[in-house]
Amino acid sequence: MDSYSAPESTPSASSRPEDYFIGATPLQKRLESVRKQSSFILTPPRRKIPQCSQLQEDVDPQKVAFLLHKQWTLYSLTPLYKFSYSNLKEYSRLLNAFIVAEKQKGLAVEVGEDFNIKVIFSTLLGMKGTQRDPEAFLVQIVSKSQLPSENREGKVLWTGWFCCVFGDSLLETVSEDFTCLPLFLANGAESNTAIIGTWFQKTFDCYFSPLAINAFNLSWMAAMWTACKMDHYVATTEFLWSVPCSPQSLDISFAIHPEDAKALWDSVHKTPGEVTQEEVDLFMDCLYSHFHRHFKIHLSATRLVRVSTSVASAHTDGKIKILCHKYLIGVLAYLTELAIFQIE
């Protein structure tokens, strides 16, 4: 599997997304009020096993293919105020002008030496769990071709997409003035992500926050993705644990043939169509026991930081790579759940 590497840092400290995505908004105050009126939501003890994609017929196969096999950085996003799908062309123009202005100020915006770029907003029709979910949309920064041929496509410099899959718990808390797309995924330079995030925050009174994935949720991902029925496996099932030690940390990698991982899951799985917390714990305990039997190492004393399967791979620092279009909606549904939980 491809290893996850930290993005290169930029000289300017202000180029980091966390330096831009700060400050409370009126919507946050509204959500805080909702939190006080509702009980604390515990992690569900069971979840549905992801089924084959329920993408609608109007989904663009080329756009779906474009989203796969790329490493995305995850963010949660509060609802967008007064966002309109009918204004996507105008948003493209305004964001394009904003990026050029920021580049002229000397800020770290990685669009090349010239300003010959184009920002494109487009919908991702069918990329949702229910009819109630808002349509997902894609934002791209593309370098304009210097050639006269209009058919020549420019190089994609940065991509981000916004989605909501089975987001009922958040949709029920906000008014019609807000568009709820709690999950944001970005691919490209962090400096570009920061600039674009700043524009969205100023324009739609929203708030971005990096979405990390803790070891508990990685275990759920490992179980749910291992449970998925595959026509053929495209990747080894792999786990990566981090061992805190001085002077530097130590990583332990454990690779399993995907069919063996599925057989192990089937041996602990008792609830048809669902994954329970007990089954997740048993699945991971079996892996720990197997590893200890062969290598005399107690993995329970380490921290799970990455899970890789034929469905997707995820890292604790909020990086994900989706590999299988059949289970795209299932993967996004769980990520949406995590994003909503972070917002609430």
Curated annotation (Swiss-Prot):
GO terms for biological process: chromosome segregation. GO terms for cellular component: cytosol; inner kinetochore; nucleoplasm; nucleus. Signal peptide: none annotated. It is found in: Nucleus; Chromosome, Centromere. Coiled coil: none annotated. The modification Phosphoserine is found at S39, S53. The modification Phosphothreonine is found at T43. The keyword Phosphoprotein applies. InterPro entries: CENP-L. Keywords: Centromere, Chromosome, Nucleus, Phosphoprotein. Component of the CENPA-CAD complex, composed of CENPI, CENPK, CENPL, CENPO, CENPP, CENPQ, CENPR and CENPS. The CENPA-CAD complex interacts with the CENPA-NAC complex, at least composed of CENPA, CENPC, CENPH, CENPM, CENPN, CENPT and CENPU. Component of the CENPA-CAD (nucleosome distal) complex, a complex recruited to centromeres which is involved in assembly of kinetochore proteins, mitotic progression and chromosome segregation. May be involved in incorporation of newly synthesized CENPA into centromeres via its interaction with the CENPA-NAC complex. PANTHER family: CENTROMERE PROTEIN L (PTHR31740:SF2). Belongs to the CENP-L/IML3 family. This is Centromere protein L.
